[in-house]
């Protein structure tokens, strides 16, 4: 999101085949299914337990002609809350000039930031919130791209470094759903080992310390929160209902989650959630690769005995 403006800028390797606005419940359901949970067990316990955007092209569709200068407007449309364009151009400067004229507020060095993407043949997706939308949490945008091998795709997190305030960090959660296991290709990654967990009381553990250590690489690293297989779209429908029942899905729309699962037909695939916290000097585009990865349940158990201490 650009500073001082409710807008999104995203380089894409191909033109999207679908742009739509989805419900925040989709992210709530994914979080409910994959978020790490540490359960502290006590001696008396008998039970053993104590990252879319979419709507079909609208308001102009494809082929809207050339914009100002060297910028070609390839798609133009809208969702309930957003107006968006997909543009191509010859230089980062021509695209930033066009976006500025179109009302997007960009950092001073954004032309240089976009130049490598333009040189690599990327298109630029830009969306801004309609002036009629009330203030509050922004709805997720869902983009569908033509299928491609994970190794040829990267997520442009490096662009976020140009709008991150000095000294600040950015927390990222990424959901990877694919036929086969997909993991980061240019960052180290690991799951937190349940054997390293220590309960220091009936309610506290060293989980946060383990997480901080796991992402402590000077160049950045990711933690695997969950890696589940086989994934079934019914799992998301069940998860959103569980979240709502437990007060974690206020305002979420189960019907929107069902609609999302009908657009994502990868039942039986592997769902992996990775998470990190990075500074500007650690942010770079996340490349993906296929790899072997053990299944990892997001729920971990650690015993605590007040008399003997944690075991």
Indicate residue ranges for each PLM-predicted region:
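Solvent-exposed coil/turn segments that connect beta secondary-structure elements
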Residues: 13, 89-92, 132
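Accessory, solvent-exposed terminal regions and/or long lumenal/extracellular loops of proteins
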Residues: 15, 109-311
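Solvent-exposed loop and beta-edge segments used for protein-protein assembly and interaction
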Residues: 2, 78-79, 166
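Ordered hydrophobic segments in well-structured contexts
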Residues: 1, 5-11, 83-86, 124-128, ...
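Surface-exposed, glycine/proline- and aromatic-rich loop segments on solvent-exposed faces
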Residues: 1-43, 95-117, 121, 125
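Single conserved position on a long alpha-helix in the C-terminal lobe of the eukaryotic protein kinase
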Residues: 39-41, 45-103
């Amino acid at each position: 999101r650009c500073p001082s403006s409710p807008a999104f800028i995203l380089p894409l390797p191909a033109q999207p085949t679908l742009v739509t606005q989805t419900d925040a419940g989709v992210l709530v359901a994914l979080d409910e299914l994959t978020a790490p949970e540490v359960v502290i067990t006590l001696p008396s316990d008998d039970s053993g337990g104590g990252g879319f955007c979419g709507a079909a092209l609208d308001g102009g569709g494809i082929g809207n002609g050339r914009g100002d200068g060297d910028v070609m407007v390839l798609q133009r449309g809208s969702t309930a809350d957003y107006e968006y364009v997909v543009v191509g151009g010859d230089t980062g400067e021509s695209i930033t000039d066009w976006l500025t004229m179109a009302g997007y507020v960009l950092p001073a060095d954004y032309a240089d930031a976009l130049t490598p993407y333009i040189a690599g043949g990327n298109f630029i997706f830009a969306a801004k919130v309609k002036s009629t939308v009330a203030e509050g949490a922004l709805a997720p945008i869902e983009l569908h791209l033509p299928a491609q091998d994970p190794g040829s795709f990267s997520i442009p997190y490096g662009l976020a470094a140009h709008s991150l305030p000095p000294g600040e960090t950015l927390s990222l959660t990424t959901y990877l759903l694919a036929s086969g296991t997909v993991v980061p290709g240019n960052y180290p990654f690991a799951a937190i080992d349940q054997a390293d967990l220590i309960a220091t009381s009936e309610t506290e553990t060293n989980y946060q310390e383990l997480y901080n250590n796991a992402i402590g690489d000077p160049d950045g690293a990711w933690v695997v929160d969950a890696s589940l297989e086989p994934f079934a779209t019914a799992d998301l429908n069940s998860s959103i209902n569980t979240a709502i029942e437990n007060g974690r899905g206020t305002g979420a729309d189960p019907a929107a989650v069902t609609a999302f699962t009908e657009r994502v037909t990868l039942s039986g695939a592997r769902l992996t959630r990775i998470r990190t916290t990075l500074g500007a000097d650690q942010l770079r585009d996340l490349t993906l690769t296929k790899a072997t990865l053990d299944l990892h349940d997001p729920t971990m158990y650690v015993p605590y005995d007040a008399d003997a201490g944690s075991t």
